[in-house]
Amino acid sequence: MGTAKPPGRGCGALPRWLLGAALLLGLRLCMELRHAGSGPPGRRDLRGPPRTHLLPAPGPLRGTRRRQVTYVRSGRRALPRGGVSTTPPEPSCCAQLGLPSRKGPRWHIELQPWAGPSRSLDEEASRFLNYIGTTQIACDRMGTNSVATDSGPALKPWLVCLDDRFGLAHQIRTKQCRLYSLGLGSDDTHFEVSMANGGCEVHRFDPSVRSAHVLQSQRLWHHRLSIDWRDPHPAVAAQKPYSNTRKLGSILNEFGHHKIDVLKADLESAEWKVLENLILEDVLEQIGQLIFEIHLHWPGFEVSGSESSVVRFWYSLLKELERKDFRLFHTYKDLSKPQLFLKKDIFNASSCYTLSWVNTRWR
């Protein structure tokens, strides 16, 4: 008699644990197939940083500005990899809209040819003295203001040209005239007071003034400032933010003045370097009339070289004024000063002259 087999234990039946494992394997396979259409597993989570955070490629990009600090004196721009720049130079930063761009700075004036083949002092002095002793334009009305023409103007050193064609008389009458007076401790303010009384706004710069800014009358200011041919060194300026030495162009910017109808200067032998600075920085274009006292008994501050080369430099400066359309309308030889020319009693020259120019393009 055969024995009966227990249910589920036949040859065709599978163990329960094997069925469970097969079921789990099938579920895992379904999940893998579902993700197969969207790429490999986990690809969505492997994103890189946003493009805005990527570092720029080496070299400047067209139309973009580089955020880097450069020195003003550096005239070179960094080249991209390879050593050759293919990008046009970018315009200078922070140019004011609506204003013409300034020309590049000049570093020296153009020296005139020598007066003669021997390059001697006699040749240079003869040319120079003849130049400052000969007026280049006639002025029918000269004086210290437009109210009344001074008597005997040829005997006075500080005079302005009041011809209507140059516009100064009109500016004074309409109270729109501005005069800058540069000096070093002079007590003679007759010219400045007369111009202020006539209707001109006068700013007198003198380092000997006790207070920083003094208003003497309605139109006459005194400023404790000295005009130099260079600004203070940045290190000095940082320690002394109220230093009393400035270039004229810097003072014009600080005061917000765009034009000077008359510039008078008595700088005791600093006039040559100051005049050179006005020429090199194109400040002359902002000046209507120029009255300078020049000193000839020595070369002047920071003017060096042989005697003939010094006189050639002086002459070249005055020729630069002529190139800027300034014309000499009055010359005054001071006979009360020592009659010396570069420490020599020669050429019948005085050590001091006052020269007056008018800007013929001034409007």
Curated annotation (Swiss-Prot):
InterPro entries: Methyltranfer_dom (IPR025714), METTL24 (IPR026913)
Keyword line: Methyltransferase, Secreted, Signal, Transferase
Chain intervals for the UniProt region annotation (Disordered): 37-62
Residues annotated as transmembrane: none
Predominant subcellular localization, coarse grouping: secreted
Compartment(s) where it occurs, according to its Swiss-Prot or TrEMBL record: Secreted
EC number, as in UniProt: 2.1.1.-
Signal sequence range: 1-38
An individual GO BP term: methylation
Keyword Signal: yes
Single Gene Ontology MF annotation: methyltransferase activity
Keyword Secreted: yes
UniProt xrefs under Pfam families: Methyltransf_22
Any one annotated GO CC term: extracellular region
Sequence similarity: Belongs to the methyltransferase superfamily.
Known role: Probable methyltransferase.
Protein name: Probable methyltransferase-like protein 24
Organism: Rattus norvegicus (Rat)
Gene name of the record: Mettl24
